[in-house]
Amino acid sequence: MTQEVDTVERAAATPDHPQPYRELGLKDDEYERIREILGRRPTDAELAMYSVMWSEHCSYKSSKVHLRYFGETTTEKMRETMLAGIGENAGVVDIGDGWAATFKVESHNHPSYIEPYQGAATGVGGIVRDIMAMGARPVAVMDQLRFGAADAPDTRRVLDGVVRGIGGYGNSLGLPNIGGETVFDASYAGNPLVNALCVGVLRKEDLKLAFASGAGNKIILFGARTGLDGIGGVSVLASETFGGDESGAGRKKLPSVQVGDPFTEKVLIECCLELYAADLVVGIQDLGGAGLSCATSELASAGDGGMRVELERVPLRAANMTPAEILSSESQERMCAVVTPDNVDAFMAVCRKWDVLATDIGEVTDSGRLEITWHGETVVDVPPRTVAHEGPVYERPVQRPDSQDALVANTTASLERPSTGDELRATLLQLLGSPALCSRAFITEQYDRYVRGNTVLAEHADGGVLRVDEQTGRGIAISTDASGRYTALDPYAGAQLALAEAYRNVAVTGATPVAVTNCLNFGSPEDPGVMWQFSQAVRGLADGAAALGIPVTGGNVSFYNQTGTTAILPTPVVGVLGVIDDVKRRIPTGFGTEPGETLILLGDTRDEFDGSIWAQVTADHLGGVPPTVDLDRERLLAEVLTAASRDGLVSAAHDLSEGGLIQAVVEASLAGETGCRIVLPEGWNPFVTLFSESAGRVLVAVPRTEESRFTAMCEARGLPANRIGVVDQGPDGGEPAVEVQGLFTVTLEELRRTSEGVLPGLFG
């Protein structure tokens, strides 16, 4: 039996008809507000639209009041290079020579726990389409991954699926994966974080925006067919009794995780680029979260009129789909374009060339309304702004948790520290052989890092570097970082430390940092303590970007990351984009470019171990105060590194972060397959020098012929620079080693074996 379609006319005539708005996540007052907006009860299709568009994920209703601070702290000077910012599909910045870069990071956390492979794969696909929608060619991806404890039973299932999903989708698209992070912590058990970043490049004049203007212009849906995947809770609308099976209009339970097809998306990318090149698109929007509900309402809301859509024209891949399901489907690999009538034939011809299904489903109107019909009957008639941009805004209670004082007071001062050479050596190997610091090659080798041929630096480097222009060598650098442990101790400082590290990681490649994006992963916004963490992190990130003089161009918020009442560590992920005028002068990570290089430590080392990897691995300790943040010092470091790169004064560079100086030394030695001898300055405490996680520090290798020039430049700029060793190939025929003079020596073979065997042993 076919369910009667709930039309606008029927809704007006049946004001008391019961509707499952609570099951769809709407609160009583939100439902009443919808009735007030419409002057009647919503139809099932309208209810589906409002429920998904007013969700936390789409509306930012709990975070919006705090996110405004980004705009308040962005100066006109910071906006000078920004071509598109917060509110667009992705941020876009001018990178010189007529080029622009667009980048964004988004979460796909919850789907990646339910179905790790498809959750992660479609996370990559979704962020790639955001970049496509700006008029850009996607050129690379990165990822920030968080899993439960490495030895927890479920971590293997989740990690295996997530890594295969990211690699399977990204590799099939032909996009290099040029970096990221993988972190294990018990707080992420049952709630992994899968944050995918994509970067694209375009000529400035090719920028596209998401708006529907020009009455009479056509709305064309193109890409994959629309199915039942990704609908989730909206399926309760398919039955008057909220029951039934999955085969017809009474189906109750539908898949909440989307299913991706990277080969369809690969063709869609090329199709879009040809459409852009032929100037056949007025406005464009990808179909991601909330599907057609989002695309139609956002295009209409951002445009200058309204929109009429004939929903029965939407190509389907499942029988008996209801209007609510069609509007809410999150089937992947779909785009929605606004096209002038004169260009429709040419648009369709390009789609046919690429074998991309394209359908004219409606047109732009001057009514100021979003009207959607189903076989001639109106099922949606709403003001589009009320769906897309004027949803509820909450000022949720914000309260610093009472437990925060005890957490901060519980410092590492009482922990036993290694002091002898043997103890320091054992500590190094303990940290290097832990899931916290071991090699990620088991994961990253499943990704293609060099496809497309424009990757200049990738995994093992602090930031990824890509060539943009073959003729001039102009390129971009990008890094993404986060520290849930530091953010738990001090959310304001933790967010700034993540920003500072991403900024520094871009700078050590020789590039100049120019823009910021973010993905803010937190627990429930209904918890005042979580909202305190969130609000502090936002302010820290915004103030930090202002201090560094680079704009936050966009971002994403992911709330409700918790299992039961246990929230994840607050994890603000920060991405920083940089520009390098010629990728030939990029600075690699590995030692050994030139024989006998001098190793110089830039920055100040302090006794800072609270929240450190050392405390975590050796004592399972989290407490105290995170390292000091000095953003003026970070800017100075970046200026020195850029100048050193331009003048050829530095042959390698590596930032200091987790694990401190000795971890950086080991990584740079392994990357360059060469040994080194560390000589600690007189009076320096060996443990503090080797393992402190003080921020604002970089280890550089300087050719012997340039040492005096480089140190003079640092001195002139007021940047501490201490000679701490030399690159040493080792005795002829002997095994290269890392030697800390007077304390210990470890061969590269032992370091490599210790580091590289951990993850294969756990997950191989």
UniProtKB/Swiss-Prot annotation:
Signal peptide: none
Keywords: ATP-binding, Cytoplasm, Ligase, Magnesium, Metal-binding, Nucleotide-binding, Purine biosynthesis
Pathway the protein acts in: Purine metabolism; IMP biosynthesis via de novo pathway; 5-amino-1-(5-phospho-D-ribosyl)imidazole from N(2)-formyl-N(1)-(5-phospho-D-ribosyl)glycinamide: step 1/2
CDD domains in UniProt: PurL_repeat1, PurL_repeat2
Coiled-coil ranges from the UniProt annotation: none
Chain positions recorded as Mg(2+) 1 binding sites: 106, 556
Residues that coordinate or bind Mg(2+) 2: 130, 286
InterPro entries associated with the record: PRibForGlyAmidine_synth_PurL (IPR010074), PurL_linker (IPR041609), PurM-like_C_dom (IPR010918), PurM-like_C_sf (IPR036676), PurM-like_N (IPR016188), PurM-like_N_sf (IPR036921)
Primary role: Part of the phosphoribosylformylglycinamidine synthase complex involved in the purines biosynthetic pathway. Catalyzes the ATP-dependent conversion of formylglycinamide ribonucleotide (FGAR) and glutamine to yield formylglycinamidine ribonucleotide (FGAM) and glutamate. The FGAM synthase complex is composed of three subunits. PurQ produces an ammonia molecule by converting glutamine to glutamate. PurL transfers the ammonia molecule to FGAR to form FGAM in an ATP-dependent manner.
NCBIfam families, alphabetized: FGAM_synth_II (TIGR01736), PRK01213.1 (NF002290)
Protein name as it appears in the record: Phosphoribosylformylglycinamidine synthase subunit PurL
Gene that produces this protein: purL
